[in-house]
Amino acid sequence: MNNDIVAGKWKQLTGKAKAAWGELTDDELTRTEGNAERLAGLIQERYGKTKEQAQREVREFFDRNP
């Protein structure tokens, strides 16, 4: 996953991300700027997942939403 491409499309994907991870606020999602590592960190923190679980969820999310 190319973080630059993700960042460029992030505004289009924030609604889908909010649907996937409803406990994250719009502001938090905006602040990640589509950065996969930041997003995974938020998911890890908010949902109590391991780093690997959060990274896998983020990777799968971006694979489903190219």
Curated annotation (Swiss-Prot):
InterPro entries given in the database record: CsbD, UPF0337_stress_rsp, YjbJ, YjbJ_sf
Organism the protein comes from: Bordetella pertussis (strain Tohama I / ATCC BAA-589 / NCTC 13251)
Name recorded for this polypeptide: UPF0337 protein BP1738
Family per similarity comment: Belongs to the UPF0337 (CsbD) family.
